[in-house]
């Protein structure tokens, strides 16, 4: 669990980058993309993905300029159907997000919880609220000041993609953050 494995420069013209990361023992690798004045973005590449000896595409990570009122999805903070439990992967990413927030003390955020359209709309609204509050509590445990955070669930009212497949539904069970 080292803090920084590699730092790399991104091509200013097209935004492309490549990295070779060598480890003695297979372990999960967190890829964080940072740029001053831009939103947090990261992805976790599991040791299973790394041990496949295939080239890994870091899932089209991009940094977006921070704008008040705009929603940003925290990659890989996804949930199982009807669950508000934070997976180990989600907790790992939230620790990195907490670090980002502590480095950017001026930011106040609204944490938004979302669900797919499976089940009852009222239950989904309550579930999404529990998800958002669970993320807020975790960030507070990681040292982010409570007064900088608020949390709200939106249920199934704001899908990111149509709920037409299991893959899409998984993407809609997500957490976004909005700059206040």
Enumerate the predicted regions with their spans:
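Periplasmic OmpA-like peptidoglycan-binding domain that tethers envelope proteins to the cell wall
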Residues: 104, 110-180
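Periplasmic peptidoglycan-binding/tethering modules of Gram-negative envelope proteins
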Residues: 2-108
């Amino acid at each position: 669990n080292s803090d920084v494995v590699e730092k790399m420069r991104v091509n200013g013209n097209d935004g492309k980058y490549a990295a070779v990361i060598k480890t003695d023992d297979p372990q999960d690798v967190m890829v964080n993309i940072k740029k001053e004045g831009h939103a947090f973005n990261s992805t976790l590449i599991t040791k299973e993905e790394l041990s496949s000896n295939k080239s890994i595409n870091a899932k089209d990570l991009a940094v977006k300029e921070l704008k008040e009122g705009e929603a940003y999805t925290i990659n890989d903070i996804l949930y199982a159907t009807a669950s508000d439990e934070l997976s180990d992967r989600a907790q790992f990413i939230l620790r990195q997000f907490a670090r980002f927030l502590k480095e950017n003390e001026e930011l106040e955020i609204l944490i938004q919880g979302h669900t797919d359209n499976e089940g009852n709309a009222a239950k989904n609204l309550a579930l999404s609220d529990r998800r958002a509050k669970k993320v807020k509590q975790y960030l507070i445990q990681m040292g982010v000041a409570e007064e900088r955070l608020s949390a709200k669930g939106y249920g199934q009212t704001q899908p990111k993609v149509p709920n037409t497949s299991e893959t899409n539904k998984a993407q809609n069970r997500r957490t976004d953050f909005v700059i206040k």
